Design a protein with these regions (language model features):
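Helix-loop junctions and terminal segments of transmembrane helices
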Residues: 7-22
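Selective transmembrane-helix segments that form parts of the transport pathway or gating/packing helices
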Residues: 36-48, 189, 193
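Membrane-interface junctions at transmembrane-helix termini in multi-pass inner-membrane proteins
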Residues: 83-105
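Interfacial transmembrane-helix starts/ends
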Residues: 27-41, 182, 186
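Hydrophobic alpha-helical transmembrane segments
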Residues: 105-116, 127-157
């Protein structure tokens, strides 16, 4: 889900939004964005809770061979939920070919992630290596949260532009159902994500060999 969100979802949303913009269909743009946001927020929450809940099972069944990784896995789970939402906003701005928000959010994301990683690892290092690793892993969460807040800020700033574009809505634009939007979203996102998933999958398989 992280690979799909990081790579496939922004590309898929940007393609769909660019098509709507080419047809002066701002209502369609809003539909693509909000439908994608709702669906991915639900999926992100489900996968986040599933990862947290299954962490102990993964360790008990030695799928994760080092039990000290339990805390790190559990602390990674909140970031999954935020990453899915973050990907929607990045895809939205990429569809407008407006890359300043994405670039700015990536800068803030790395600043908060690295500073949190160093700070938490340093704080917990004397309390145990597993806690230090967990703290460093958890640093992903404040990083992606900072990136998301930056994108929300840019989205709020664009409200006047959106209202102006809605007033120029193409009356002949075709209205798609929400189900069609969701199907197209994943039909575009999954193939793009396969390349990103292959390398982690190979590494995962290597751990079992």
């Amino acid at each position: 889900i992280v690979s799909i969100s990081a790579a496939g979802i922004p590309v898929a949303i940007s393609i769909m939004i660019a098509e709507k913009l080419a047809n002066d269909d701002m209502r369609g743009v809003q539909q693509v964005f909000f439908v994608s946001l709702r669906v991915l927020a639900i999926l992100g929450l489900v996968f986040s809770l599933a990862l947290y809940g299954s962490a102990q099972w993964l360790v008990d069944n030695q799928i994760i061979t080092d039990p000290r990784a339990l805390i790190a896995i559990q602390l990674l789970s909140p970031a999954i939920f935020v990453v899915t939402i973050l990907s929607c906003f990045r895809g939205y701005f990429q569809g407008f070919q407006y890359m300043v928000p994405t670039g700015t959010s990536q800068v803030f994301e790395q600043i908060f992630r690295v500073s949190s990683m160093v700070g938490l690892a340093y704080y917990f290092i004397d309390r145990g290596l597993h806690l230090a690793a967990g703290g460093a892993t958890f640093a992903t969460f404040p990083g992606v949260l900072a990136g998301l807040l930056v994108l929300i800020y840019f989205y709020y700033r664009q409200r006047n532009i959106r209202e102006q574009m809605l007033s120029q809505q193409n009356p002949n634009a075709i209205c798609e159902s929400n189900g069609t939007v969701v199907k197209r979203l994943f039909s575009l996102a999954i193939p793009v994500s396969m390349a990103n998933i292959m390398l982690p999958m190979v590494s995962l398989i290597d751990t079992f060999i």
